[in-house]
Amino acid sequence: MDEADFSEDTTYKQEDLPYDGDLSPIKICNDYSFTSKNDAFEVSSQIIFIADDPQEKAMHNETCGNTAMTMPLGKTTENAANKKDEKEKQCTAALHIPANEGDASKSSISDILLHHLSKEPFLRGQGIDCETLPEISNADSFEEEAIIKSIISCCNKNSWPKEQTLELTDQLNPKKDGENSNKPGSPTMTEENTSDLEETVAAGDSSHQENVNILTKTKGPGDKQNSYQGQAPPKQHTEKASSGNRFKYGQGQVHYQLPDFSKIAPEVKNPKNNIINKPLAIAKQVSFSKLREKPAVVQDILETMPESNCVEKQHQEQKGEITEPSQQIQMEPTVHIHQELLTGIESEASISKLSPTSQKGTSSSSSYIFQKISQGKQMCQKLKEQTDQLKTKVREFSKRIKQESPYHLQDKKLVLEKLQGHLELLEQNFLATKDKHLTLQQQVHKHESTIVSDFDPERKVEGEIFKLEMLLEDVKDKVDESKYTSAPSLPVSSPVTLDDLASTSSSLSNEVPEEHPGHPPGPRGSGGSEATGTPQGGPQEAPKEELCELTPQIYLNGHYGDATVQNQPDQVAMRLSSNSGEDPRCTPGRQDCAETTAPSPSCAFCRRLLEWKPKVEKKGHRRIHCGRFSTVHEKAPHSDSTPNSDTGHSFCSDSGTEMQGNKCQDCGTKIPTSRRACRKEPPKEFHYRHNTPGENYSNHSKRGAFVRPHSLHESKNSSPSLASPFCCPGLMYSPDTSKSSPTPGWQEAELGLENMKSQ
């Protein structure tokens, strides 16, 4: 070979392997770049050899010409490690070519490379020694073996010779066919070109310089893209793998100026026999293509088949891939490398085997938990439906309570108890289901980060149960109300007619008690009302023996009435309002009340009573104070009222004083029958005794002891009877006593009593 300088530019670019997508059969370009259609894997290396003296150049050229190029395995490993750490970076270095070289292709670098890169930064670099791993002495150490395992693909793919890549470039790049067809180192790729390849390898320095020139020209991006368009079949790869086991000095170095490895004795020498190396290239290409295609296949299988079958098939495929290249390995250095590769693939297989298993366990447990959670949601939906049904029943029952008669009270209670029992059971089921759901939700949060929805997020079921409970409370209240109103209630007050008043005993106001000196009369207000059927007790028993029929007289009961009003005003008001036939005209705070209703005018007595009314109105007196008792002389504002047979004789009475009268029936007077025995004593024995100190008995006449102005002679034919009584506590009606003396009043009273006695 000539002593001409040998320069070679290589650029190396790599991306991670092996699972980047589908891999088409690998194409070998003239710049040692192994690429796929999607540019996922590119390995481009340009090797620069720097020689300081002609002897080293000659040694290096001779080694290249004889195809006996060697490279330390340890250094290759180190270079490959650096390439993996600094991926997608390009490094070029160029040896200074002497000026006396005549060939332009030998002394120039590609314009494209010079456009992007310059030689000076690489010539002034520190070198690779400051960045790389130790030298050849540690090539067989454990750390380097681990590195070999991780980047074995890079080591094997970069072992193609320059001559082989030159011919492949001529075939794959149509643009370079016309240029390279005339050169002796670019024959067509056929089976007969194996001998031509050997001749080209042994040609000499000129062929090497031409090859380097061609390699340099194809470094541009456009040439790179053109080189990807074609695809060499596996058979051509096999034929061109003549020197695939040749390791170049400094191959795979990145970014640094490479030292001269020509003086270093190679540790591994590869024979020239091309047939031995053919199975290696085939095995590697097939293995990597399968590894690249494996992720998509595994993913499809995982989605379509059970996990257990998927794991077994995946493991079998990996074993098949492992055994296939191992059976084709025939060289000692490559056997060691492939053993490392086998170890890495087996570890990957074990990892992939474990990960689907763990994924299976996790997915199975999570699916079980999610199944339980879905069951909890279904149970919540069932609870809501049950709540709605129970609410419908409660509403129907509430309507039935209003419609049914009160005699079905016991049935209502039974139905209410059943509804309450259903409500309690529904609440218990709701709480139990909610607790289960919460427990499952906590388990999911421990294993996974999946967010699980709440059992009752909007608390709809809980709200419905609460409304149902309130509705049942209302129904219960209605049932209780119906229980109290179920028994027929007695009327509080019944209308008091005149017949009832006639049949009852005479009131205490019609009775004139015989009082002895020093014995004050008992309070009239302590007794009950005869109209309401309440018995009178205590001091009220004494008047039973007294006269009950003093027809023309209405006695002045001032002190009794006063005491009654003062002591029991509430009872007076109650009893007055209890009689529907009574028209209470006086209140406890009012001491003057006069009321009368005339019976049918067919009665002569009633006619005379009506004639007497205007006289009373004209001669009314106001008040005459006598001690603490007051006698009221006033007009009768209600005496002019129209005769009303429905209401009968209305009167004002306290709790212990009641007046009753007769009703004229068929123009006749009816004699009231007293329940008490009447005393036939002369009226002279009747006295008004007042225990009030300072009271003058002579003033009794002025207070008007009797208020019957009409003559009793006219009513002799009709038995003495009580007409409409006029009595209020402490009140009375009296004629004008200013013009008449009290004597005629007493005379009338005595005359009336005598008539009664004679009858």
Curated annotation (Swiss-Prot):
Residues 679-688 have a biased composition (Basic and acidic residues). InterPro entries: AKNA_Centrosome-Trans_reg, AKNA_dom. The keyword Plastid does not apply. Keywords: Coiled coil. Residues 181-192, 484-496, 639-654, 735-744 have a biased composition (Polar residues). Residues 371-482 form a coiled coil. Residues 169-246, 484-543, 634-654, 678-723, 735-759 are annotated as: Disordered. Residues 497-509 have a biased composition (Low complexity). Belongs to the AKNA family. This is Protein AKNAD1. It comes from Macaca fascicularis (Crab-eating macaque).
